[in-house]
């Protein structure tokens, strides 16, 4: 995500976009809609806020890329292995964009971003899309990035990923393959839960990929209408889809 990116290359992109009359917008689901815009939408009900937490709890046994899952995140590795996630500053860098975006939308300044990483072992072998996670290696990962406002952790992004539902039972859980939550401590307290995929809670992997793509596809006409430059969801209207019922109507009229 580009929000509040390093000014040296952000300024270059901004200048190039304006010179060429182009607009550039990025989004997704998490990071993306569920990690920032959904939370901001929920705050329209708030009188005051102590803390906003946007979180994802996901079963990622379907993800097939071993390099990302093992070397990047540490799954299937012993706890003394240092994945990319453990690189100092990586979690803060990875999640600061939605934190700064929410802060900007609410008109507050982030003093710093604090990142933490936790991992838990599996006590059994787990068959997953990229191979086998052996007993005694990492079977669940939890990251947390907290934006500090007025000295307190006020805007928090949490991410819990498991390779099986029974790993790390003391962490936040979900009956669905992927659950996105927004929890706002304030007046009033607000809690919003969003799931993707079938109603039974399965198929979230495919649904998340579709949602990620459609966040961008549905934004196209709004980005075209926007002024040249680098855009965030704060710069364009809610990206309501167009012609969204056309395909469904065609199938109803001609199911063959």
Report residues per predicted region.
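Conserved active-site and cofactor/substrate-binding residues in soluble primary-metabolism enzymes
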Residues: 8, 32-33, 89-97, 140, ...
